[in-house]
């Protein structure tokens, strides 16, 4: 039981940290100067975690999406703008969906509520699912061919890269201290992965699965998420930007995409379809969205809706920096009774200022027959409100 408990905490905090994110898809337009991303749409539109996009084909996108407090797999059709769940796991959830080569089936990591983690193949037609690679706790898979997988797996308290032969049922350890981003390099027989052996500067490396040869491609500093265009140009996400880098031509990365959308913040996962015409990205919702979510929960006196956008270790200050209390449960204790016992509670928003990851609300608060002015400063990180300062 100690191992299960530790592993569950490790997975929850390291691999599947469920922030409030959305999946967006753009058209990639080639121009004389390079590329433009146009016609962006939010294909998830869901409160909670939506992430890990993968192009099933050029017109369908798989991704993991939260519903009923669990995470299932959605497939979104870009032609019809429709989506449907293709998994339904009441006592757990699925992550890291991918299409299995030369098959209509998909693979996904299944994480049960009790901490049990397995890697499954899902058959669309028969709805029969079977476990594959039972000897590894696969976290981030990437298919090389239908019989070969490069898998990032959990070993003790870190991530390790394995070359898995499904026919021979062998798993060969390749490297330790690995990042989550593993991809096939277009037009080659190579896979790329991120080595985190150097804590100050992570390296993007290539692996030849046939002879296990490893070479360094470039330094990524401390960037976690990458993908490839069909012409072997590397894309790297960082903050609200995506950068491009041609390992054969470029000395340094250059700007590929800069978001002007307030609802695209801290871009993480990125994926490109096979013909290079579509790009999917995962981004956090805007700080204003989080402030508005708790604002509406407050006026409804709904304690769960009010607390939802707050981080577990949220800190509450009195201006300028006097800590009053911290922790979500402390916040629940303070507000739950207040909501129940204050029938006339209402907050009116007078003015809102949004600056980077902060929201400043000027409010009129009515409670117990009295109305007063208030100012609240909300600071957000990783899709959650991490601190509130009252003036």
Named regions from a protein language model:
Residues 1-20:
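Bacterial Sec-dependent N-terminal signal peptides
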Residues 65, 110, 283, 310, ...:
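Short beta-strand segments enriched in hydrophobic/aromatic residues
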Residues 286-302, 309:
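Short, aromatic-enriched amphipathic alpha-helices that serve as compact interaction elements
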Residues 332-391:
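A beta-strand edge to alpha-helix "cap/lid" segment located at domain peripheries
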Residues 18-289:
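Sequence signature of WD/YWTD-type beta-propeller architectures
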Residues 303-352:
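A solvent-exposed, acidic/Ser-Thr-rich amphipathic alpha-helical stretch
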């Amino acid at each position: 039981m100690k191992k299960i408990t530790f592993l569950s905490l490790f997975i929850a905090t390291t691999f599947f940290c469920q922030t409030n994110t959305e999946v967006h898809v753009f058209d990639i337009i080639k121009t004389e100067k390079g590329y433009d991303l146009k016609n962006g749409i939010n294909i998830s539109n869901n409160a909670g975690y939506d992430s890990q996009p993968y192009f099933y084909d050029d017109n369908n996108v798989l991704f993991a999406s939260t519903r009923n407090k669990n995470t299932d797999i959605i497939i979104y059709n870009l032609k019809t703008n429709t989506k449907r769940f293709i998994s339904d796991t009441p006592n757990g959830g699925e992550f890291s969906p991918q299409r299995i080569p030369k098959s209509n089936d998909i693979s996904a990591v299944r994480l049960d509520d009790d901490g049990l983690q397995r890697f499954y193949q899902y058959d669309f037609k028969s709805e029969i699912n079977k476990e594959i690679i039972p000897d590894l706790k696969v976290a981030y898979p990437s298919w090389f061919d239908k019989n070969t997988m490069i898998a990032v797996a959990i070993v003790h308290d870190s991530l390790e890269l394995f070359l898995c032969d499904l026919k021979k049922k062998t798993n060969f350890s390749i490297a330790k201290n690995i990042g989550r981003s593993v991809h096939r390099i277009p037009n080659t027989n190579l896979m790329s992965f991120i080595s985190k052996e150097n804590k100050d500067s992570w390296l993007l490396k290539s692996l030849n699965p046939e002879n296990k040869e490893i070479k360094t491609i470039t330094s990524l500093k401390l960037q976690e998420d990458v993908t490839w265009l069909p012409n072997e140009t590397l894309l790297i996400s960082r903050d609200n930007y995506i950068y491009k880098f041609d390992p054969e031509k470029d000395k340094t990365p250059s700007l590929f995409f800069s978001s002007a959308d307030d609802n695209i913040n801290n871009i993480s996962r990125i994926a490109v379809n096979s013909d290079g015409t579509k790009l999917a990205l995962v981004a956090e919702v805007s700080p204003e969205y989080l402030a508005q979510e708790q604002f509406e929960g407050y006026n409804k006196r709904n304690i769960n809706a009010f607390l939802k956008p707050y981080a577990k270790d949220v800190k509450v200050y009195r201006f300028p920096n006097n800590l009053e209390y911290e922790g979500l449960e402390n916040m629940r204790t303070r507000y739950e009774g207040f909501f129940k016992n204050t029938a006339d509670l209402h907050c009116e928003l007078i003015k809102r200022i949004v600056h980077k990851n902060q929201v400043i609300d000027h409010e009129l608060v009515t409670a117990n027959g009295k109305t007063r002015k208030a100012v609240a400063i909300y600071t957000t990180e990783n899709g959650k409100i991490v601190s509130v300062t009252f003036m």
